[in-house]
A protein has these predicted regions:
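Alpha-helical scaffold elements adjacent to nucleotide-binding pockets in ATP/GTP-utilizing enzyme cores
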Residues: 68-71, 94-102, 124-130
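Acidic carboxylate-rich catalytic motifs and surrounding loops in phosphoryl-/glycosyl-chemistry enzymes
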Residues: 84-87, 114-116
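SAM-dependent methyltransferase catalytic-core segment centered on the flexible catalytic loop
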Residues: 2-83, 89-96
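C-terminal target-recognition/interaction regions appended to catalytic cores
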Residues: 198-436
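Conserved S-adenosyl-L-methionine
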Residues: 106-117
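Short glycine/serine/proline-enriched coil/turn segments at secondary-structure junctions
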Residues: 91, 118-121
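Flexible, glycine-/basic-rich loop-and-beta segments that form/coincide
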Residues: 123-192
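Secondary-structure boundary elements
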Residues: 73-80, 104-107, 133-138
Length: 436
């Protein structure tokens, strides 16, 4: 409730007034809630009068910061509003209804890292923005100066708002139908960099301690959506996450990517050997071996030759209407052709696979990294890493191996992946998965 003196000044007296408020930046949700391992915080935001009166503002109004913002906007009309805050009220999908109401002219602002503030965890951008609420402009894109912790200007960055006119990447990937039996599983977390860490590919679905399905493995990967999911996966990981782009949104792309086979196949190879591709033969059949038994010098036949058939164009589409209105399948109908960069990744991976089967698969020997390591003829890259690196007492995979040859081969693979990522990155902006 506004004090009477303050209310009188605002309503009657033409004096300039500067008001300093330190609103609580408490959110109803947190990381555990996002991953479905926790619940919304009780009574953080849904017990206030502001919350009750502004249900039309969507999920954003759950946050006390947004409640302060909208109350100032409505009760002190025409004021100049300046604030330090996260960027979500400018670009997050949950704040689309909020931005339909909050109309103002952006005057000036800058971005700095969150870790320059006391008692703030994480590395993400904090924006200082000044708004003239007497001019009602729709927020479309805002340019900020970016400063580091030493007050050094790094660049100018544009923050784009999604206001229903520009969709995020989520409706794009979910329109591809998963027809047939599952080959693996993946997920679709919130479409910004901060949520990339939850994205992975696995051989089986994973469940949380409470029995609910983990979001990271809720979607089937089948022949009909494999290539789009690998593109989605690559798009989200190719561009390195930093504190500056932590809240940037991945978007529904233009259609130009559909005809770019090199881009599609580059993403296919990149996703196949990325560290977050955690397909393991221990969880089920490994359908994603891109090499023949002869190439790897092993005698035992693989359980699945799906990926080889897919790459050779031997998988037939079971339905033409894969893309809905586009009526186009992304199952190859002829052998996939790869760029030099992608071929280099495949060759580096092949050398690593050969070394694994040579060392771990030597019949008649008891070669092991530790007691929990076993030879898997159908091993995926994740299994190979586990074999050579082992796990610590907490069950986490060690970051290094004592095997120097393995380390050399793995580094070769990582380096070729980095070069491939550099080739993919410009296309991500060209096809508008991200905006510069």
């Amino acid at each position: 409730k506004l004090p009477e003196n303050l209310k009188r000044i605002i309503q009657n007296e033409p004096e300039k007034l500067v008001i300093f408020i330190n609103p609580p930046y408490v959110e109803a949700g947190n990381t555990k809630h996002v991953t479905r391992t926790g619940a919304n915080k009780i009574a953080v935001s849904n017990t206030s009068k502001v919350w009750a009166e502004n249900q039309n503002l969507g999920l954003g109004i759950r946050e006390t910061f947004a409640q302060f913002f909208i109350r100032i906007y409505k009760e002190i009309p025409g004021c100049v509003l300046a604030s330090f805050s996260k960027l979500k009220y400018i670009n997050a999908t949950a704040f689309v209804p909020f931005r339909r109401i909050f109309l103002a002219q952006f005057l000036k602002g800058f971005i700095c890292p969150s870790y320059t503030f006391d008692n703030v965890n994480g590395k993400f951008p904090i924006a200082f923005a000044i708004w003239n609420t007497s001019i009602q402009n729709k927020i479309k894109k805002i340019k900020f100066n970016v400063f580091d912790e030493n007050n050094k200007k790094l660049k100018t960055k544009t923050i784009y708002s999604t206001n229903g006119d520009k969709k995020t990447i989520t409706p794009w990937i979910t329109k591809f139908k998963a027809l047939g039996d599952a080959l693996a599983y993946s997920g679709n977390n919130a479409p910004d960099f901060q949520n990339n860490r939850f994205l992975k590919i696995a051989a089986s679905q994973h469940f949380l301690p409470n029995g609910s399905l983990n979001n990271a493995t809720k979607y089937k990967i089948t022949p009909t959506n494999l290539l789009p999911i690998f593109i989605y996966f690559s798009v989200r990981y190719v561009v390195k996450a930093t504190w500056i782009n932590d809240r940037d949104q991945f978007l529904f792309p233009n259609k130009n990517w559909e005809k770019d086979k090199e881009f599609q196949h580059n993403c296919f190879v990149y996703a196949l050997f990325h560290g977050q591709n955690k397909i393991s033969n221990k969880e089920g059949t490994n359908h994603f071996i891109p090499f023949t038994e002869k190439e790897l010098n092993i005698k035992e036949a693989f359980e699945s030759h799906f990926l080889l058939d897919f790459m050779a164009g031997k998988i037939k589409s079971t339905e033409k209407d894969i893309l809905g209105e586009n009526k186009e399948s992304f199952i190859p109908t002829k052998p996939m052709e790869f760029s030099i960069e992608a071929q280099n990744v495949l060759n580096a991976a092949k050398a690593l696979y050969i070394y694994y089967h040579q060392m771990a698969g030597d019949v008649g020997t008891a070669w092991k990294i530790n007691d929990k390591t076993e030879y898997l003829p159908n091993a995926a890259l994740y299994d190979i890493k586990e074999c050579f690196q082992g796990r610590n007492e907490k069950g986490r995979m060690n970051s290094k191996s004592e095997d120097l040859k393995y380390t050399e081969l793995l580094n070769d693979l990582k380096n070729t992946q980095k070069i491939l990522a550099q080739k993919i990155e410009p296309k991500i902006y060209e096809y508008e998965f991200l905006l510069e």
